[in-house]
Each structure stands twice: as C-alpha cells, then as structure tokens.
Amino acid sequence: MTLLADRAPAKVNLTLHVLGRRVGDGYHVLESLVAFAGTADRLTLDPDAPLGLTVSGPTAGPAGPTDDNLVLRAARGLAARVPGLRAGAFHLVKRLPVAAGIGGGSSDAAAALRLLARLNGLPLDHAAVGAVARETGADVPVCLDPRARMMRGAGEEIGAALGLEPLPAVLINPGVPVPTAPVFRALGLSVGQDLAGAPHPTIPQATATDTLLQALAGARNDLEAPALTVAPVIGDALAALRAQGCRLARMSGSGATVFALFADRRAAVRAAAALRAAHPGWWVAPTFLR
C-alpha cells in the first residue's frame, strides 16, 4: 500500500489569557484564540510495516527519544481503544522547533491520529479518537482539525472553526527551548486563585483582518511576562520583529517562539530575510496563519 502523508502545522496562540487555576486538578484555566501556520512538520505512515517511528529533519535531534514521542503515544493509545486497529511505521520530518510554544509535538500527535483514522475509516469525531487526543496532551484536541478557533479551560473546550482571512506572518524562535512548567511556575498562581485582567474580546465567526487586529490589540498573552524571566532573549526577538514595521508582535504559548503580523505577504518575506541576516542562529519562518 502507498504511504499516507499529512502535515502537522505550527499552532500559534494569537491570544492567551490565563483566567486562574482551578481547584481539584490544579490546571490553569485559559482562554485563547489559536491559528495554524503554513509552516509544518510532515508525517508519513507505511501501513505495511510494524508500528514504529523514525525521525529526520533539521530539528530531529532536540525532539528526543522516539519511544517517548507523542506520535507513538497517540498510536498506542488508539490501538488500545480500537480492537484490530491497523497501524504501521511512521516517519516524521521535524522542521518545527521543540519546546517552542507552537504545539509541535501536539500537532505531530494529531497528524498521527488523522492518518490512523484515515487508514481505518474512522471519522475524526469518533469517541476513541477524541479520548486519545485528550489523553495524549492538552493541545492535541485543537490540533486534530487545524483551523483557527477559540479554546478554553485546560484545552478541553474547543470552539467552532472561525472564518479568518489568511494572516501574513513571521515566526521567530531564538533557539532557546522553554519548557511550559517553569513559565507557569513563574506566573505564580496558587490553586483556586484567579488572575485579574480585561476579558477576552469576542471574535465573530467571520472577521475581517482589520477588525481582528483591533480585537487582538485589546488582548494579550499572560504568559509573556513570566516567560521573559525564564528566557530574556524572547524580549530581543519581539523587539527585532517590531523593528520590521509589523502590525502586531506577540509571544505564542509559553514561548520562546514569537510571531508578528504584517500588512501583506511581501512585507513578511522582506522582514524574514532581514531577520535571518541579522540573526543567523534564529529559526525564522515567513508564513500565513489561518
């Protein structure tokens, strides 16, 4: 049988409001507008080979041991829930930076679930697919159908897909991995504590870019300030983006990746070229978010 293939796009938090930390499980309660980039990892599945995973690509090294990769965790989880599930050998071409605040591992796991669902004739809203997505990681469910939408809670409340116009953007990672846990520790919320702040703006189902940018200007990423204490270079990356004349610059997730929105594709490509020349050690990607 021929190989099955899918993309695992970067997930970008255009906003990320932390509402508090809930009693019971201690999870932080979030409200976030997420979009997905044209920049992506690539995952293939060979159904004629035994279950396994190989990894190549420019960021394969930092991705860590394959046995603990979320791709295999998702595949094994689905096999445990669906008797007779056909699987196979996965190959991941890793292009996205690791521990970078853009959900690379979660998107890879979601791509694995899509490939297995396609191979076995399962709809993406199959109960087992959704359950395994939730078990594999908080960001995996929103990555199953990678289109812009609101997500809330600890990732379990996912809104309908939004009809955003494609947003010309540049993503930058300054080459410093930033695990999520230290950033949340730096935020310093106790269990049961709420975080004061302006409410998240309402994002209509279909939003013109200028209207969206006005809404984004009234929003924030509450993890940006604590992430700067963990990795101050994030501030340098944001300053470098703002110097290129962008319309908005912000950190994604818990960092260290930052993004900027530009007036058009040409401006984004021009800014990316200038940033690569000035910072050859940084990961820089002109793209669209949608």
UniProtKB/Swiss-Prot annotation:
SUPFAM superfamilies: GHMP Kinase, C-terminal domain (SSF55060), Ribosomal protein S5 domain 2-like (SSF54211). Pfam families: GHMP_kinases_C, GHMP_kinases_N. It catalyses: 4-CDP-2-C-methyl-D-erythritol + ATP = 4-CDP-2-C-methyl-D-erythritol 2-phosphate + ADP + H(+). Pathway: Isoprenoid biosynthesis; isopentenyl diphosphate biosynthesis via DXP pathway; isopentenyl diphosphate from 1-deoxy-D-xylulose 5-phosphate: step 3/6. Keywords: ATP-binding, Isoprene biosynthesis, Kinase, Nucleotide-binding, Transferase. It is an enzyme of class 2 (transferase). The active site is at residues 11, 139. ATP binds at residues 97-107. Gene3D superfamilies: 3.30.230.10, GHMP kinase, C-terminal domain. One of its GO terms (molecular function) is ATP binding. Catalyzes the phosphorylation of the position 2 hydroxy group of 4-diphosphocytidyl-2C-methyl-D-erythritol. Belongs to the GHMP kinase family. IspE subfamily. PANTHER family: 4-DIPHOSPHOCYTIDYL-2-C-METHYL-D-ERYTHRITOL KINASE, CHLOROPLASTIC. This is 4-diphosphocytidyl-2-C-methyl-D-erythritol kinase. The gene is ispE.
